[in-house]
């Protein structure tokens, strides 16, 4: 289906100001049309569908009641922001979502005044909203002005400690601040579900008696699935020794639960809060992820992240796979190893599917732990599992491991505990852009004493590295691998345990050595082929380890070649810097060795395809070829420059 939906009312909305002249009934119609437009757009671009569909009515209500952009609506994670972008002057570009030079899939300050605070990681919204509230009261100035600050945060994000740190501070300061808890019951599952005991208590204190009266029947007004969710939470509250909810004990006035899809409930509550709130308020709205689009509602992940799809059937249009994904290779290999070793267990932070641990969880649920959005806790939990004699694999995206870095240092590395870090989404990741790039883990992991750091050049190497990590008990060990499909190499039947700190020579050559760390090896080999056509035959090597370095191999490469170039999918300070330190310590530079290190540039690279992103970073085969020609001084003058990115 290619026809766009008919949206006569939505067509009249150029900015949120246009919503204010509409009746409540018309706002409800706008919400209906906005939902259809969101589905249509994401069917073309792919992206986070379910989250946006769950907040359509809330988005319309917020922008119609509050005075954005003076009032700051801060979307936690912000993957639910597509309807928000449509209403805030970006509808004409909505079908460029997550594409090169298109709209970001998240809120972004540089994109619109209606995006006051960028996001993509979870649980930051309340801290940001509190900051805006304090800035307002201290006389801070922005171009749009400073009014109310409204944080919209999901139940999953509320499982992170940062959200409660912010609420604790907000309650102490007592500033006028509005938090909307978007409870779609998707993320608070039994393993991380203690918080769910607090998610339903009607507000009982002045000055909101009118709200209490309005909300008294709210549970009975909810659709059956929501009534059950509210009942579940209220039942769990009965045994509490102290009165009031957790939110009230933190200093927040609590309103709810209300049906987050019912404009007749949303609009009066928001209008009353806007008119009368004096301190921090939490509004508990119960919603349904994927609301209004049956294929998303019935999907296992409620349409959390989709490829392009057919609007009628919901069938996703995924390109045929030529090789297994790195994530699936990790998950399958770990599960197979767990069958042989009962001490192997796994920890992830709200990403069992994304990290491939769903395979392990299905077969060994008692040894697989989803700790929720709690990377700090997850790392320390894994550290103590290791101290207790288990073999924990802590599987996290590179970008999210950053959130638990102090624990990596303090609880794992200093104690030399054998935690195995499986670092997924290493390097540039494509459509999710800079916020999800795994650019820094080589540097921040390899700088830690006693940490072993590996990078897989292909899916077969990853299989070996999982086995190597399982066999290594002398201290912490990490291995990194990218998003997406492998290289299509032949997979070994059984993994091999690699010798720690030993790389491999792929192709013997002369004059220049290309030393790759990670999956740039494929591009290095393409560059070597192009160079061979010019009469230059480089040596190609796969380092495998950034720490400990293969000292013998690196010094041999330096001795036998006039130039040595390292290539890695990481920021400066990583593998190449460690190689340079070794060469410096051994006085190799004194002999005249020409050394270059190809790393990601010192900038944040916006979303595009991975190939386009690596082109922008000057890290693809033609750039490697140009670097060799330049360092050897054999390029013509017009070939000395790197290809335009």
From Swiss-Prot:
Entry annotated with the keyword Methyltransferase: no
Any Pfam family matching the protein: Transketolase_C
Catalytic activity field: D-glyceraldehyde 3-phosphate + pyruvate + H(+) = 1-deoxy-D-xylulose 5-phosphate + CO2
UniProt cofactor note: Binds 1 Mg(2+) ion per subunit. Binds 1 thiamine pyrophosphate per subunit.
Cofactor: Mg(2+); thiamine diphosphate
EC number assigned by the record: 2.2.1.7
Subunit note: Homodimer.
PANTHER family documented for this protein: 1-D-DEOXYXYLULOSE 5-PHOSPHATE SYNTHASE-RELATED, 1-DEOXY-D-XYLULOSE-5-PHOSPHATE SYNTHASE, CHLOROPLASTIC
Biological role: Catalyzes the acyloin condensation reaction between C atoms 2 and 3 of pyruvate and glyceraldehyde 3-phosphate to yield 1-deoxy-D-xylulose-5-phosphate (DXP).
Similarity-based family: Belongs to the transketolase family. DXPS subfamily.
The protein's name: 1-deoxy-D-xylulose-5-phosphate synthase
Species annotation: Ruegeria sp. (strain TM1040) (Silicibacter sp.)
């Amino acid at each position: 289906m290619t026809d766009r939906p008919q949206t006569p009312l939505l067509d009249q909305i150029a900015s949120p100001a246009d919503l204010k002249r509409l009746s409540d009934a018309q706002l409800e119609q706008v919400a209906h049309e906005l939902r259809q437009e969101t589905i249509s757009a994401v069917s073309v671009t792919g992206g986070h569908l379910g989250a946006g569909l769950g907040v359509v009515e809330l988005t319309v209500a917020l922008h119609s009641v509050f005075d954005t952009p003076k009032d700051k609506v801060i979307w936690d994670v912000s993957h639910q922001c597509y309807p928000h972008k449509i209403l805030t002057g970006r509808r004409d570009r909505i079908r460029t979502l997550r594409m090169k030079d298109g709209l970001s899939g998240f809120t972004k300050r540089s994109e619109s005044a209606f995006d006051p605070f960028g996001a993509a990681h979870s649980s930051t919204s309340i801290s940001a909203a509190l900051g805006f509230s304090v800035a307002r009261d201290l006389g801070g100035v922005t171009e749009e002005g400073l009014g109310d600050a409204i944080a919209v945060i999901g139940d999953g994000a509320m499982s992170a400690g940062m959200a409660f740190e912010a609420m604790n501070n907000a309650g102490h300061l007592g500033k006028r601040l509005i938090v909307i808890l978007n409870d779609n019951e998707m993320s608070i599952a039994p393993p991380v579900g203690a918080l769910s005991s607090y998610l339903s208590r009607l507000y009982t204190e002045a000055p909101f008696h009118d709200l209490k009266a309005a909300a008294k029947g709210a549970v009975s007004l909810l659709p059956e699935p929501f009534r059950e969710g509210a009942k579940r939470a209220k039942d769990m509250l009965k045994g509490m020794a102290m009165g009031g909810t957790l939110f009230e004990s933190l200093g927040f006035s609590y309103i709810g639960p209300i049906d987050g899809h019912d404009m007749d409930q949303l609009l009066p509550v928001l209008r009353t809060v806007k008119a009368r709130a004096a301190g921090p308020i939490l509004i508990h709205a119960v919603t349904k992820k994927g609301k209004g689009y049956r294929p998303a509602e019935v999907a296992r992940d409620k349409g959390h992240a989709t490829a392009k799809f057919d609007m009628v059937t919901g069938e996703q249009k995924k390109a045929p796979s030529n090789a297994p994904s790195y994530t699936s290779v990790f998950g399958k290999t770990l599960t197979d190893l767990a069958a042989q070793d009962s001490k192997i267990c796994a920890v992830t932070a709200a990403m069992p599917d994304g990290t491939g641990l769903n395979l392990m969880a299905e077969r060994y649920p008692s040894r697989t732990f989803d700790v929720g959005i709690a990377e700090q806790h997850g790392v320390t939990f894994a550290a103590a599992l290791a101290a207790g004699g288990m073999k924990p694999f802590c599987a996290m995206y590179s970008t999210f491991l950053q959130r638990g870095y102090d624990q990596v240092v303090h609880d794992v590395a200093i104690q030399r505990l054998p935690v195995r870090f499986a670092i997924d989404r290493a390097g540039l990741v494509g459509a999710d852009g800079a916020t999800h790039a795994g650019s820094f883990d080589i540097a921040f992991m390899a700088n830690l004493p006693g940490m072993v750091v590996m990078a897989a050049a292909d899916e077969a190497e990853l299989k070996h590295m999982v086995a190597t990590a399982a066999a290594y008990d002398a201290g912490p060990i990490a291995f990194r691998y990218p998003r997406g499909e492998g290289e299509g190499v032949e997979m070994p039947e059984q993994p091999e345990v690699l010798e720690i700190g030993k790389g491999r020579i792929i192709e013997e050559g002369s004059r220049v050595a290309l030393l790759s760390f990670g999956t740039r090896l494929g591009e290095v080999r393409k560059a070597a082929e192009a160079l061979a056509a010019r009469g230059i035959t480089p040596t190609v090597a796969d380092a495998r380890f950034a720490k400990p370095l293969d000292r013998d191999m690196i010094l041999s490469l330096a001795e036998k070649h006039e130039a040595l170039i390292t290539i890695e999918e990481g920021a400066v300070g990583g593998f190449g810097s460690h190689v340079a330190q070794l060469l410096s310590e051994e006085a190799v530079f004194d002999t005249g060795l020409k050394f270059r290190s190809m790393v990601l540039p010192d900038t944040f690279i916006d979303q595009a395809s991975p190939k386009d992103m690596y082109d922008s970073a000057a890290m693809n085969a033609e750039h490697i070829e140009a670097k060799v020609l330049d360092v050897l001084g054999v390029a013509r003058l017009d070939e000395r420059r790197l290809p335009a990115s």
